[in-house]
């Protein structure tokens, strides 16, 4: 199965950096044993995470950063 296009994925995040971080965190969860929200599409956790993001099965929430004093 092909990767979701970057155009589709960028509509799900406010920046490429956010997309990379969200994908990496989800891939780590899958590697740690959390089940995928999709049928078996790949053995690669990053590929699974990208498909989950592309299909709106997972989202991210930006936390407010605390200001350094």
Swiss-Prot record:
Under catalytic activity, the entry for this protein gives: RNA(n) + a ribonucleoside 5'-triphosphate = RNA(n+1) + diphosphate
Q: Which keywords are on file for this protein?
A: DNA-directed RNA polymerase, Nucleotidyltransferase, Transcription, Transferase
Record-annotated membrane-spanning stretches: none
For this protein, the record's InterPro entries field holds:
DNA-dir_RNA_pol_omega (IPR003716), Pol_omega/Rpo6/RPB6 (IPR006110), RPB6/omega-like_sf (IPR036161)
Which is a GO BP term held by this UniProt record?
A: DNA-templated transcription
Q: SUPFAM superfamilies recorded for this chain?
A: RPB6/omega subunit-like (SSF63562)
Which Enzyme Commission number(s) are on file for it? Answer: 2.7.7.6
Q: Which Gene Ontology terms cover its molecular function? A: DNA binding; DNA-directed RNA polymerase activity
Q: Which SMART domains would you find in this protein's record?
A: RNA_pol_Rpb6
Can you supply one Gene Ontology CC term for this chain's record?
A: DNA-directed RNA polymerase complex
Q: Under which main EC class is this enzyme filed?
A: transferase
Please give the family membership noted in the entry. Answer: Belongs to the RNA polymerase subunit omega family.
Q: PANTHER family this protein is in?
A: DNA-DIRECTED RNA POLYMERASE SUBUNIT OMEGA
Q: What is the purpose of this protein?
A: Promotes RNA polymerase assembly. Latches the N- and C-terminal regions of the beta' subunit thereby facilitating its interaction with the beta and alpha subunits.
Subunit organization: The RNAP catalytic core consists of 2 alpha, 1 beta, 1 beta' and 1 omega subunit. When a sigma factor is associated with the core the holoenzyme is formed, which can initiate transcription.
Q: By what name is this protein known?
A: DNA-directed RNA polymerase subunit omega
Question: Gene encoding this chain?
Answer: rpoZ
